[in-house]
């Protein structure tokens, strides 16, 4: 199978041999839905029970096929959400069609394990996944998920999956929380939950984008916007190893949710890669040249008021984009609505959890 050459991208063509190139995307996270049984404070995509969207089988297969065109045998597909197991029959149909069409195996399937309440059901589903070519299962276990998901199904799923799939094919993110009931925080008061949030971030840092740029980011905000002057995102866009594709076909670089590089319903993924140039999309150009601080000029002209402090550059970027989204600025790039809070963030930075 022929793999695309770096020179087939329009940005790379005019670069000297030593200049950093726009890398080939080798992985794609296919977000089957924005719907989730949880609404975790650190979710990059604002997933929740109120959300919807379901990636059509054909869209999923097209993305899968396109990634193979891009990366050949190195292509890695993972299925995520939202929570894919909310749509079990749809998930099975995707996997069955992929196998039928010879698209190879799915590298990773993610779940929070909410459904794993019966040993027989777990075994039946895992055996079906093995038969359909899923290589690894990733189970989300952390204080953020355990605010919504009982730990017992996740434990049961992890134990059964390690027995049926083998321990090397089961990833628990994060294993340390699997046996610790202190982190089942659904009944904690706000102050207690916040203490656990802070401890968790210190153990396993994450970006403050999506819902994480709301209340959670406010717990860590310590730097003024000016502290991020000159901190650009060029390396992040050029060096991204993969993309996420949402249920509607929108393509996001890495984990930069809410910044649309293209839509595979309109243009195949490999053509989006070929046409990507960091200077052609205004928002991306500014981020690559100046970072999120560079977005302030336009935002201020429209009435944006800075927060006293931000947690990181992703917090600054997301907060500004939330403001621009609400004013319908660059809607083809700043979207979709699922990736943004449903209402404006007040001065403290909190965004409504939906």
What kind of feature is each model-predicted range?
Residues 2-111, 116-121:
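Conserved alpha-helical substructure of the radical SAM core
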Residues 36, 40-43, 254-256, 314-317:
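Short cysteine clusters
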Residues 127-267, 271-275:
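Radical SAM enzyme [4Fe-4S]-AdoMet core and its adjacent flexible, acidic
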